[in-house]
Amino acid sequence: SITLDLSRPQGRRLARKLVGISDVVLENFTPRVMFNWGLDYDHLQKVRPDLIMVSLCGMGQTGPWRNFAAFGATIQALSGLTYLTAYTPDQPIGLGYAHADHAAGLSATNGQGGG
């Protein structure tokens, strides 16, 4: 495996090279981050026209929350899951682990292979 520092130009250059020989890109940044780095779908499709790209931006690609990061605990709270797992209505506690993070990753990997 490799690690790329996408905040650096050389990391982004290497990422684009890898896209050229890849079938699928899966990422979980906010849309603003990928666009600013030139690594959003519109840019990467020019490198590899038949690219499959899966974006796990938890707050969506559009809408007022699109540039907010989504973490498992945040999504659990916003969805009402922390309320459902509370001992009492005034003390929500959540699941104790990031169920939403695992579910999102599993759904994304299953979804990209379905075409």
Positions of the model-derived regions?
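A structured beta-alpha segment of the ubiquitous adenosine-cofactor-binding alpha/beta core
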Residues: 1-46
